[in-house]
Amino acid sequence: MSSVKKLSIAFCYHMHQPVYQLNYDSDYLMPWVRLHTAKHYLPLILEAEKFPNLKQNFNIVPTLTDSIIDFSGNALDIHSALTIKDVKDMTPDDKEFILNNFFDAEYTSMIEPYERFKELFNKRFSENCGIDDFSLQDYADLTALFNLVWIDDSLYKRFPEVLKLLEKGRDYTLKERKRIIDIYRKIAKLFVPACKKFLRDRKAELMISPFYHPILPIMTNIKEAQENLDTVDSTLSDLDMSDDARLQIEAAIKRSEKVFGRKFQGSWMPEMGVSENVLKLLSDFNIKWTIADEGTLSAAMNYNFIRDFDGNLEDPYHLMKPYVSKTTGVNIIFRDSMLSSLINNEYPNYSPEDAARDLYEKIKVIQSKLTTSPDDKHLLTIALDGENCWNNYSYNGREFLDKIYELIENDYSLETVLISEYLEEEKHKKEIDAIKSSSWANRNFQLWIGEPVKNLAWTYLKNVKKDMDNILLSNKKGMNVELARKELFLCEGSDWFWWYGEPNDSGQDHIFDYLFREHLKSIYKYLGEDYPRYLDLPLISTIQPTESSVDFPITPAMTGEFEDTEWESANCVSVPDGPILQGQKLFDKICYCADYDKFYLRLYLSDCIEEDSVNPVLQQMYIYMKNPDRIQTQSPVRLINKTENVSPVMKEKFHNELRVSMTEKKLYPIRFTKAIQDGLWAIQNSERIEIIYKDVIDIAIPFEDLDVRRGDTLEFFFANTNFGIKDAFSPQDIMLSIKRPQ
């Protein structure tokens, strides 16, 4: 039997946040840099203190580094500014913001364990709750607790005051709240020195990224980047930002060398976006290596990696070797996407011990299949985000990481490595002919371009860059070219295009849209020109009702069965897959129409309602409706946003609410309510509402019950819920509309 060959493991963590400022000296509109530094970034880097042989690889995007440095000084975000504000001076808007945003934490691990936080949560999400239902001390305690629970417990030894304040539990003073924010500054101050220490000790390696996290394959060759997309926008065919791609890499190298005191040898391209053009750029800047997804290798080799029922590779050899590009000489290592996905998505559902043991066993399976390899050295790359998954673990994943690192450290046949050191010693790299333009997501860029709203954002960016280039040709005096170019680079970042359109939903899309357009406007300001007025128009449909394309009367048969030709003439809206890591959509398609007397709906159920008949799961959907053509008593949506910022549609008020509840095989009685004074709802007689459930759900509601007269417009939207907890909108963040025929 062949002896086991040593397997090297490269743990790689990507740390990135977009710029949350309107300009370079303003407060941050979102707190995520500050919070993730205390909860994830610094604790992850400090893991190396616990294990003498542990080596980790980190990609810290330059914009994140600068933001962390900013927070180590006097920078504030809206959350921290409100935390250190005297509650006696808080305005109604301040209080509304706190109630809508200071519960943005994972409920099970960050809210429920703390009695006072849980008490405030339950109070906030009780029916008919408003800002005046909370005392000044409630606001003081809520702001304090929100910030305290975002500090990882691994930092308590360095900051014992955090634990004391958590144990106090309530009645926080202004002095204590200011102290909490001061602790955040001290945490931020530790970040860069910790990185430098582990760099010196050869326990960490840092990788470069273009400064503002742009997707370089799109910027350098739009035609290649649009391959394998569902739709291609021909108006973007002339998009070319190759010059900016080069400048963003150059700026990142200069800044990173200044902050960390050394030149980086490796890179993590944003969204693992690589192409031949990108490799050429890296070669030009003497970047020795980059990371890509296993799907990119599969496409380049025209080779499918086959996995067994447990997800283990049948033949891991090709994925466990570093490659060198024949055309550029740049080394490429490819991550095992299955293992990275398990850490991101599956292992949070395990106990830390079981998760670590499962990962260890999968690593050992890979190792066992390499005994017949012709080579002695092999590299397993596990690469993932440094923040997104850890809140779903107990103790922010620290127990899991401690255990897997311990198992590896105690196994003489395994080792963790710094990538540059490994590549320097590896003499048997495989050659690769050409890399196809691809990302970590399905080998294409569908999540950032191709969807109509995303394409519109790219069009805005393309047009503004063209304007800027033309303005610069004038060489007029008074232009601040440096700041204008920074604003342009910032708008080239991938995050804008990730959140625009389908399928992703931040819960704060309206803020991202506002920031994107404001930064584009600032380019013209720094160049001394007026900005084009189209930049005042939101790219996203926030609360603007859609136009009904069918305005003639249709009376469909109420059968609940697919075969019904009348519905073929109705308005239909396809519901895309829901936001990543959120609940599944309840419906694939929604059709609607009207005749002179009734409003009709047909709901096509998605696969998520299929279930084990022994344990049926109750699904709920709310329909909110109003008539914008006349004055009506209206009440707010009474659904809970458990962890998200409030979306614009949730701030609207409506005249009627219909709740539909079902399992796979059973329809429960509907609840029909009408808005009454003081923002309340009263149950109405629903006998005249028809509802049939077989293959689909058919609903017919008399217009009279909705206070919609002939010629009036009915606006409506749907919300999937889990017992009153808002799961997703259908469609996302827009309202549909239809006119009652005259």
Predicted segments, located by residue:
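Active-site and substrate-binding clefts of carbohydrate-active enzymes
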Residues: 4-165, 306-552
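Catalytic domains of cell-wall/extracellular-matrix polysaccharide-remodeling enzymes
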Residues: 243-308, 388-408
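Acidic/polar low-complexity flexible segments
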Residues: 550-551, 622-651, 694, 704-742
